């Protein structure tokens, strides 16, 4: 094990000098430095650059407070390694695989794997054409998720990405019954804490591993924590041949941390100040999140859209890797429609008659056509009013508004805020409900009866209470 000495510390960047005869550590190797003589407080550094003349530049995974020039640094000879396997279930980790819950820490001999790996080769991959039912009407009807697929939840600040991902955990993890891995990347610690206790109460935690590198962590930890969660998921897929659910909240923070690290390493910034290696870093992460012939990884990733600008390089780079996109729209939150999923901007590779069936496909495309026509007519309505529309257009607008409201529903995880119980709607019920609205079966019911309900039967009950 070769050793060097700290030459300089600039925030989370630490330069380490190795003696001229010593072997330099490889890129991505983990180095250890002890802050105190008792060797109780250690900091892990990851090699990022070799500067020449025995000097390497590293990124710290923890705060560098207390580090001084001249402290001894040890090369572990391998990348950061984290615990994997059944022992990880029900536990909460940081980027280094250290437990941060109140339970006993792991034994030294627990099975560990490095966080840096190659993506599976082309001949190992497998694809699926089976739909993953979420119980959320707008998703199941218009942008269905594939088992073993990759899903992105796009949205600006405060439009409901985390609530939607928590509802998906509630619905899918409980129904799925398999193994889930939740990775919190640069998000609020409070949300992670709430999620942990909710999962503990519901019992889902027994089949879930949680990894957190939150907003208060150094950029190195936020950049690598997604790889830690992914390594745990990969083990279940490859070694235990499981079907794994991988939740990541938020992929944008991974890019943001990469941008901070890139600037600290002295690289020239690229478009909008992002790192020049943005596409490479995103590709290396996303290509590992895939399904192989041994098992599947279904990943659901929240992706923050800065200033609601979808052309920003961070969300635009993530788009290319996804099977389904669920776009959250601020205008819908202003109308009180939750989840605020844009039915026309969201898309899915799975929405084809071969995968979802002829009836589902026909209903979904007709719903999109009606909503698109309503959007085109809104300018006329705003300027001239409803009276200028033909009878056929008036009927279409009425149905479009009912569809728009019926695409909303109450969430189980939001019950504490709304006071209303959440609903899980099977796909068959969703398709039947929208088909009947399109046929004009409920044209006589008030539009408000369609707002925030579950299946179509709830609309009828709500209308009866309103006196219709």
Swiss-Prot record:
Organism: Streptococcus pyogenes serotype M49 (strain NZ131)
Recorded GO MF terms: ATP binding; ATP hydrolysis activity; proton-transporting ATP synthase activity, rotational mechanism
Family: Belongs to the ATPase alpha/beta chains family.
Gene expressing this chain: atpD
Cross-referenced CDD domains: ATP-synt_F1_beta_C, ATP-synt_F1_beta_N, F1-ATPase_beta_CD
Any one GO cellular component localisation term in the record: plasma membrane
The reaction(s) this protein catalyses: ATP + H2O + 4 H(+)(in) = ADP + phosphate + 5 H(+)(out)
Quaternary structure (record): F-type ATPases have 2 components, CF(1) - the catalytic core - and CF(0) - the membrane proton channel. CF(1) has five subunits: alpha(3), beta(3), gamma(1), delta(1), epsilon(1). CF(0) has three main subunits: a(1), b(2) and c(9-12). The alpha and beta chains form an alternating ring which encloses part of the gamma chain. CF(1) is attached to CF(0) by a central stalk formed by the gamma and epsilon chains, while a peripheral stalk is formed by the delta and b chains.
Protein name as catalogued: ATP synthase subunit beta
Matching NCBIfam families: atpD
């Amino acid at each position: 094990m070769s050793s060097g000495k700290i030459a300089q510390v600039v925030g989370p960047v630490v330069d380490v000098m190795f003696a001229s005869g010593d072997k330099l550590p490889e890129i991505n190797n983990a180095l250890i430095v002890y802050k105190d003589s008792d060797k109780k407080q250690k900091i892990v550094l990851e090699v990022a650059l070799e500067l020449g003349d025995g000097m390497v530049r590293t990124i710290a995974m923890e705060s560098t407070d207390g580090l001084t020039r001249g402290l001894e640094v040890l090369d572990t000879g391998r990348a950061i390694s984290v615990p994997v396997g059944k022992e990880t279930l029900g536990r909460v980790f940081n980027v280094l695989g250290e437990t941060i819950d109140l339970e006993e820490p792991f034994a030294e001999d627990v099975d560990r794997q490095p966080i840096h790996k190659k993506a599976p080769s082309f001949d190992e991959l497998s694809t699926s054409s089976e739909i993953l039912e979420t119980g959320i009407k707008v998703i199941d009807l218009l942008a269905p998720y594939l088992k073993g697929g990759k899903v992105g939840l796009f949205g600006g600040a405060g439009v409901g990405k985390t609530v939607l991902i928590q509802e998906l955990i509630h619905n899918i993890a409980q129904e799925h019954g398999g193994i889930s891995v939740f990775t919190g990347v640069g998000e609020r610690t409070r949300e992670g804490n709430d999620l942990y206790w909710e999962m503990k109460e519901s019992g889902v935690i027994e089949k879930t591993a949680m990894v957190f590198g939150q907003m208060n962590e150094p950029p190195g930890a936020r950049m690598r924590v997604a790889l830690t969660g992914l390594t745990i998921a990969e083990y279940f897929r490859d070694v235990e041949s499981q079907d794994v659910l991988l939740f990541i909240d938020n992929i944008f923070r991974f890019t943001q941390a990469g941008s901070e690290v890139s600037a600290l390493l002295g690289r020239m910034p690229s478009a909008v100040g992002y790192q020049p290696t943005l596409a490479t870093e995103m590709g290396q992460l996303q290509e590992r999140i895939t399904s192989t012939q041994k098992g599947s990884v279904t990943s659901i990733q929240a992706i923050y859209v800065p200033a609601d600008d979808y052309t920003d390089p961070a969300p635009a780079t993530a788009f290319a890797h996804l099977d389904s996109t669920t776009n959250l729209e601020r205008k819908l939150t202003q109308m009180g429609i939750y989840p605020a999923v844009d039915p026309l901007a969201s898309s899915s590779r799975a929405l084809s008659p071969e995968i979802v069936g002829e009836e589902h496909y026909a209903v979904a495309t007709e719903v999109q056509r009606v909503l698109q026509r309503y959007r085109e007519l809104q300018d006329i309505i705003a300027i001239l009013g409803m009276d200028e529309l033909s009878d056929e257009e008036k009927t279409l607008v009425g149905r479009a508004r009912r569809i728009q409201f019926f695409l909303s529903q109450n969430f189980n995880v939001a019950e504490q805020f709304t006071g209303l119980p959440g609903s899980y709607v099977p796909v068959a019920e969703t398709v039947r409900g929208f088909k009947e609205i399109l046929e004009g079966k409920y044209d006589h019911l008030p539009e408000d009866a369609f707002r925030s309900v579950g299946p179509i039967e709830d609309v009828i009950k709500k209308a009866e209470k309103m006196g219709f």
